[in-house]
Amino acid sequence: MEALGDLEGPRAPGGDDPAGSAGETPGWLSREQVFVLISAASVNLGSMMCYSILGPFFPKEAEKKGASNTIIGMIFGCFALFELLASLVFGNYLVHIGAKFMFVAGMFVSGGVTILFGVLDRVPDGPVFIAMCFLVRVMDAVSFAAAMTASSSILAKAFPNNVATVLGSLETFSGLGLILGPPVGGFLYQSFGYEVPFIVLGCVVLLMVPLNMYILPNYESDPGEHSFWKLIALPKVGLIAFVINSLSSCFGFLDPTLSLFVLEKFNLPAGYVGLVFLGMALSYAISSPLFGLLSDKRPPLRKWLLVFGNLITAGCYMLLGPVPILHIKSQLWLLVLILVVSGLSAGMSIIPTFPEILSCAHENGFEEGLSTLGLVSGLFSAMWSIGAFMGPTLGGFLYEKIGFEWAAAIQGLWALISGLAMGLFYLLEYSRRKRSKSQNILSTEEERTTLLPNET
């Protein structure tokens, strides 16, 4: 792939050089970089399959066990809440714990608890089932946070000059996980029952653990002086965090609601419901590498990708139902088309956020090493988790009260507000820089005039 062919060797800025950079061929991937890509691809694929497998059939099973739509939304949402808390801790202590250990341990626990989720159908109905669902999801959330925080940091360390390209390319595997999870889960559920999808997927993730223990390189760094709170206090970082939050909530909103809406509206079997999820995930997976390459090759484009991606996402969610005031009839082909466009707009907005935060951190005095990468990774995961908690929780509640059409429109307002806020910030930033540049030119002209000899 051309994007990866141009990547430079793992030469970290600030003299914090990753191992294995010696003896590598300029302009091509070193052995360690290839291993890092394989490890990150495996965790992206496995983790997103574990996350998305519930969508087509779990809401229906949970209803049989006595859970309401609101409770189902909270079961989906609690994953993100505890991922938020764990991401902040793991991001702050990444250097102390060790990136490789955090990565491998996260995958191991994630595979184990995925298998545990498969035996929950044997738990008694009602409060006991609901409590066990929450417990297993919390354990999965902590392991997911560990693996993903470590993965992002290791990638940014190995590819310091092409962060967006690499992250965007690897989002293909995240998208592939989102693509494969629902249809594979729906098919296995329809063919073999509730337990088999979780046991199969959990075993696949566990098989990836020894591979990553062997091939993933160790990266060491000294602890940094800056904190998470200093990073989030930067205005630009705070607004980008809001963008991440809004987009994550849009993804999360669909987990407890879309399958129920499709089953009710179009009477599709569970296996076909998984295929509806395919449109958004596939377009996101395909577009992410392109937007990553654009973000690295043309950094000024990042701001416009962020803004317009949010605005397009907002429009998509208005049309997802569609919202009744538009008087457009709900049709399956229209729903799939809107999900495809929404996947494209999500990739447009999400991919530039990590390099934008990292760039802003470096501009404001954060050191260029693994410590800052851990903070940025933790912040990204934490903000994503807030949205992924609020999206399903609020989505399940609104679906129950006002129906899918209006609930989706309200969800779209979140993306609209974040897009407009980000656009306003960039306009103010441009105006401020232009005014500062004009003042500097004027000051330079005045100094030059005073230095010229007076004419007699």
Swiss-Prot record:
Main localization of the protein described in the UniProt heading: membrane
Cytoplasmic side: 1-33, 92-100, 149-161, 217-230, 294-304, 353-377, 429-456
Function text: Proton-coupled polyamine antiporter involved in the translocation of polyamines from cytosol into secretory vesicles prior to their release via exocytosis. Uses the electrochemical proton gradient generated by a V-type proton-pumping ATPase to couple the efflux of protons with the uptake of a polyamine molecule. Facilitates vesicular storage of spermine and spermidine in astrocytes with an impact on glutamatergic neuronal transmission and memory formation.
Record keywords: Acetylation, Cytoplasmic vesicle, Membrane, Phosphoprotein, Synapse, Transmembrane, Transmembrane helix, Transport
Intervals, Extracellular compartment: 55-70, 122-127, 185-195, 252-272, 326-331, 399-407
GO biological process: serotonin uptake; spermidine transport; spermine transport
Membrane topology: Multi-pass membrane protein
PANTHER family named in the record: GH10249P, MFS-TYPE TRANSPORTER SLC18B1
Catalytic activity: spermine(in) + n H(+)(out) = spermine(out) + n H(+)(in); spermidine(in) + n H(+)(out) = spermidine(out) + n H(+)(in); serotonin(in) + n H(+)(out) = serotonin(out) + n H(+)(in)
MF terms in GO: monoamine:proton antiporter activity; polyamine:proton antiporter activity; transmembrane transporter activity
Modified residues (N-acetylmethionine): 1
Transmembrane segments: 34-54, 71-91, 101-121, 128-148, 162-184, 196-216, 231-251, 273-293, 305-325, 332-352, 378-398, 408-428
Gene Ontology CC entries for this record: secretory granule membrane; synaptic vesicle membrane
Keyword Transmembrane (UniProt): yes
Record-stated family: Belongs to the major facilitator superfamily.
Skewed-composition ranges (Low complexity): 10-23
Compartments where located: Cytoplasmic vesicle, Secretory vesicle membrane; Cytoplasmic vesicle, Secretory vesicle, Synaptic vesicle membrane
Protein name, per record: MFS-type transporter SLC18B1
Gene: SLC18B1
Modified residues (Phosphoserine): 21, 438
Domain of life of the native organism: Eukaryota
Record region (Disordered): 1-24
Matching Gene3D superfamilies: MFS general substrate transporter like domains
Tissue and organ expression note: Expressed in various tissues including lung, placenta, adrenal gland, liver, testis, and brain.
